[in-house]
Regions:
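Short, Lys/Arg-rich, polar N-terminal cytosolic tail immediately upstream
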Residues: 1-16
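A structural signal for multi-pass alpha-helical bundles of membrane permease subunits
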Residues: 17-304
Length: 304
């Protein structure tokens, strides 16, 4: 009888041991379920309603989604998003990588540390301050036009954010030279984790720095590329603060992006049902692009 009781007690402890790790993360899942999953599901449901954010809520089926096809502002915003997304990915995977390669090749430790801190310091500056600084740079009486006038290029002086021909390009050029930030640190840490033995072996074969970049560094940084591309895609779909402060989507809709259009529909026109439909479409597009990125960007090991 004692043996049976002892066996039962051990069985209970064994079951508890198996579920114990899940109990520790249960509060996190409850919080995510309450504040993330519930709100996401609720927004998807409300996308089928004509809803003002209050009590007025009328089921209209797919009408909000059908309205997107005739929404010229949404169409323009998607075109702008495509351009911004492509240029953002190019900016993220090129210049920060080049700067990380440069720092890795600096032989003086003090000089390398100086460059690291120089690229990191701008991260602590509030983004609103940086946005307003660039708004002044692009102003008709701002720094950019002042430099152009100084070097004799007055014919290029224009209202960069107020001209439909230059507004989108100015938004893309915002925060030039796109070096400082987490992208630089991610590439730098990835390069530092590549075993020295790999470099020593290829140096004996007389490989050039350019060959080293394309045949060793870039393949072994596939994980970093994948992470940065995913975060860039998500940021491009969700971010609109700098556009709101720089141009507010104008002139016209030349710099409008879907996230800002969603914001306007929600808090300017109180068309919450349509805004939920916009959010649902953006969520599905972001998920699809992230899935493609995760599936086709393979992370090799250093041994390969």
């Amino acid at each position: 009888m004692r043996k049976i009781q002892k066996h039962t007690g051990n069985g209970r402890r064994s079951v508890f041991t198996k579920i114990e790790p899940y109990l520790y993360i249960l509060p996190l899942f409850l919080l995510l379920g309450t504040f993330k999953m519930y709100s996401t599901v609720y927004a998807i449901v409300k996308s089928f309603y004509q809803w003002d954010g209050g009590r007025i809520s009328v089921f209209i089926g797919m009408q909000n989604y059908i309205a997107m096809f005739s929404d010229k502002v949404f169409g323009q915003s998607m075109m702008n998003l495509g351009i911004i997304l492509i240029t953002s990915i190019l900016k993220v995977v090129t210049i920060p990588l080049i700067m990380a390669e440069f720092v890795m090749r600096v032989k003086s430790k003090k000089a390398a540390d100086f460059y690291k801190y120089a690229f990191i310091v701008p991260m602590v500056i509030p983004s609103v301050v940086i946005i307003m600084l660039w708004r002044w740079i692009y102003d008709y009486n701002g720094l950019l036009n002042g430099i152009l006038s100084m070097i004799g290029l007055e014919r290029f002086v224009t209202s960069w954010l107020g001209d439909a021909k230059t507004a989108l390009g100015a938004v893309i050029g915002y925060n030039f030279p796109w070096v400082a930030g987490i992208q630089f640190l991610i590439f730098l840490s990835g390069l530092q984790n590549i075993p020295d033995g790999i470099y020593e072996s290829v140096e004996l074969e007389g490989i050039t720095p350019l060959q080293r970049l394309f045949y060793i560094d870039i393949p072994l940084l596939a994980g970093q590329f994948r992470y940065l591309i995913i975060t860039t895609v998500v940021t491009a779909f969700q971010s609109f603060e700098h556009i709101l402060l720089l141009t507010n989507g104008g002139p016209g809709a030349t710099t409008m992006v879907p996230a800002l259009h969603l914001y306007n529909q929600s808090f300017s026109y109180f068309n919450m049902g349509y805004a939920c439909a916009l959010g649902t479409v953006l969520f599905l597009m972001t998920s699809f692009i992230s899935y493609i990125n995760m599936k086709y960007i393979r992370t090799p090991s250093a041994s390969e």
